[in-house]
Amino acid sequence: MIKLKLLMKSMFLVCVLMLSMVGVSSASVSVTSDSKYFDISSGCFVLEGKVLVKTDTRTIGADKARVNLVTKEVWANGNVYVEEPQEEIKFKGGSVYASDELKTAIIKGDAILERPDITIQAEKCSFNWRTKIAEFSGLVEVHQDGKTNVYDVIQYDVINNKIIDAK
């Protein structure tokens, strides 16, 4: 009987926690996937299959992800993209860590940005959605005007479509 009461209290606390998280996040974050569960130990939703994490201004898509709705952090991998449709910005890669607090998405594993006049490909890209500056590092290839240039690191102004620093 004591075990049953303890189990009921635990389930009640889990439900309250989940409902409070949904209430905090429902105005600004939408999360969908083929399957999901809440991992109590990490405080994250674990998502698999056609994962979409949407805010008012950006979408993260992936095969798998972990999402913390309290800290607004996303860890995702497999066919990852980070998109801001209103700005026509779309990064692709193998994995991403995104943090609302840092206003940054870090894309790793063949990170690519394709624009009408330029394609940038690198091992890693860090995109700050407040400044709209993307920093590419690790064998950076810039395909532009029929030419390919290779750099170690570049900074790219996504709004003005220009490289602002290259090394």
Q: Locations of the language-model features?
A:
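Mature-chain termini and adjacent capping regions
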Residues: 1-167
